[in-house]
Regions:
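Intrinsically disordered, low-complexity
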Residues: 1-86, 176-187
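A broadly tuned, weak detector of single residues within folded domains
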Residues: 37, 72, 97, 138-140
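Solvent-exposed, acidic/flexible segments
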Residues: 65-72, 96-101, 131
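Secreted/periplasmic proteins that engage bacterial cell-wall peptidoglycan
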Residues: 74-118
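Residues that form or immediately flank small-molecule/cofactor binding pockets and catalytic motifs
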Residues: 92, 158, 186
């Protein structure tokens, strides 16, 4: 079942036969933040590519996603291509590092939707809704994410290497207190 898929379910092996975790560490240090030029970077890349494939396939079973408008679905599919990209606080580069509000702004701008630069200001964008729909913004204190459907979000999470951080899908939008839910769509 793809929905119960966890990064720990995958073991990669380096060229010398040493088992490495998907984040490129040997499992001894869960805070490994090695650069993308190290010998294990291709394993992280392979893992994020696999994660994108698994997540995209899982969307077919996501009831809310399937029932959403075409534009809302396109927002999610567009955002998901960046799974595994790096998080940088204050960053605005989708390739070199981006923070949560710059990520939501980047994704929505692709669809002609304007958002302010910081998460606090994004809490006032669009219209307030009580229940999230695919493509809506989930606003927290100091953080913002895009709702996928069936309780899941995509967001630029934190500075840790993917899959622990970076741009990723999280399984519950209620993982912390929600301040507001904002819709930028007219449907």
């Amino acid at each position: 079942n793809d929905e119960n898929y966890k990064s720990a379910d995958i073991t990669y092996y380096s060229p010398d036969g040493t088992a490495v975790s998907p984040n490129g560490s040997n499992g001894d240090d869960d805070t490994n933040e090695s650069s993308s030029t190290d010998e294990y970077s291709n394993y992280r890349y392979s893992y994020s590519t696999l994660a994108k494939t698994v997540m995209t396939q899982a969307l077919r079973r996501n009831t809310e996603f399937r029932q959403a408008s075409k534009q809302r679905q396109e927002v999610i599919l567009y955002a998901m291509q960046y799974i595994g990209n790096k998080y940088v606080y204050g960053g605005e580069s989708i390739t070199d590092g981006i923070d949560c509000s710059a990520f939501t702004r980047y994704v929505m701008r692709h669809f002609g939707k304007k958002l302010p630069r910081n998460s606090y200001s994004q809490r006032s964008s669009g219209k307030s809704v009580d229940k999230p729909n695919t493509g809506d913004l989930i606003c927290y204190s100091g953080h913002v994410a895009i709702y996928i459907g069936d309780g899941k979000i995509i967001h630029a999470s934190n500075h840790h290497a993917y899959p622990r951080g970076g741009i990723k899908v999280s399984s519950s939008y209620k993982y912390r207190a929600v301040r507001s839910i904002r819709s930028l769509f007219n449907d």
